[in-house]
Amino acid sequence: MRNISLGLHMGHDRSVAIIENGMIIGALAAERIDRKKHSISAKIPFETIDKLLAYLEISINDIKYVGITYAAVDIQNLEDYYYDQLSDHYKNWNFELVCVDHHLAHAASTFYTSGFDKSLVFIADGGGDLVNGNEESESVYIADKNDIVLVEQRVQSNIIHTLSRKQFHILPFMNDAFLKHQISIAKKYEQITYMIGFDWNQAGKTMGLASYGNCLIDFNVPEIKDLQFELTLDYIIEEIYRMYESSGLKYPTFINKYRQDIANTVQIYTEKMVIAIVGYLIDKYKINKLCLAGGLFLNCLLNHKILETYPDIELHICPATGDDGQAIGAAFRAYRKFKDTTLLDNSKNIPYLGISYSNQLIKNSLENFNLKYDFYDSTDELCKVIATNIYENKIIGFFTGRSEIGPRALCHRSIIANATWGGMKDYINQKVKHREPFRPFAPVVLEEYERTFFNLKQTSPYMLLAPTVNE
């Protein structure tokens, strides 16, 4: 008997996921279908649903349970609205629906893909759903095969939801009434990202730039005794602004001159705070398995620092740790709620959960764009050709199998090139990606050699750890 649940996330990074008989069998970001980066909309991504179901050979009528997530809303108020949207689009479909809290969906996405029997779960993002008029900012759960239970939570002011406005990241524009509003760690990182001239969802640029700078502030992170620590809107912003005032420079000149140092400053603060929180959680709850989720944990420098500081823990981060992983958590929670059964070990089912394409469809696409190609029946022969091209410093567009979940290109939809040529990074950034020269790339090695090259504390299959290189 087929017991199938559908997970849906609306907002930014819309996504769809499918659980069948306790196993995740499909997950797809809407941006892969609508070709709109981060696919932002309150609308249900029906085309993405249909594409994934067609690929999996599942009818909408086979689905019994639906889980829905959003962000920065009282999610339970949306149940009737989205039930009506689904039942109006898919006629004569009988299903049960549950709206899942944003941070709980993050927790489910990472714990149920970890393979752990029991774990601490730490969620940190820009903001989750509303809690008494405020937004979730950091949450801690204890998870086992029976349930995921919230044990601690911190909230932030809902007034700072849109940080792109000048009154939230440039001190003279800040309303005095806002200065002491609480803000999440991830939101603080986003705030500094705007301060140094980047845009929404470009915190990864700040992380990349941070490696070129030096910390401007000697942080004295307080001892963490619970999750109710102070982090206000003006913190770091005010100190950097005072440095600008004493610099004798114009504000744009100051920011441009010191932007890598400002980036490094927020990176160091984030690392120190999160490491202190993790230490507090390990000490209090005496659990050495830790699952992480939320957009903050796309920061691979931070993630490696956690393992470097606490080498005895077992760490899992879902490859779709941002909001594109929400649908996975929603599907798991819907299945768990309505089926009321223990979910199976899904750690081996990730990250390749999207759609694959037949050779004929690929040929048709190449011919539609008048692109030349050679077709190889032999995989061995194809691999030799690829290896030869890489050796000759040619750049490979690698497209194979089912697409990855999450924002990282994990060799199913990847650009691959020779890392031994010193000019390759700059060449790809300039000629292929058309982006800033400081943007990094990830090295790829066979798993058996990963600790030969890198100071890894555990394996890194999802491009979510940034270890140092062994000499």
Walk through the language-model features, giving the residues of each.
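Short beta-strand-loop/turn "lid" adjacent to the catalytic site in phosphate-handling enzymes
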Residues: 54-89, 95, 108-109
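Phosphate/pyrophosphate-binding loops at sites that engage ATP/ADP/AMP, CoA/4′-phosphopantetheine
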Residues: 48-64, 277-287
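Active-site cores of enzymes that catalyze phosphoryl transfer or operate on phosphate-rich substrates
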Residues: 208-268
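Short glycine-rich phosphate-binding loop at a beta-alpha junction
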Residues: 60-73, 286-295, 396-397
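Flexible beta->alpha loop and helix N-cap segments adjacent to enzyme active/binding sites
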Residues: 9-38, 83-99, 104-107, 111-235, ...
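N-terminal phosphate-binding loop and adjacent alpha-helix
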Residues: 32-58, 274
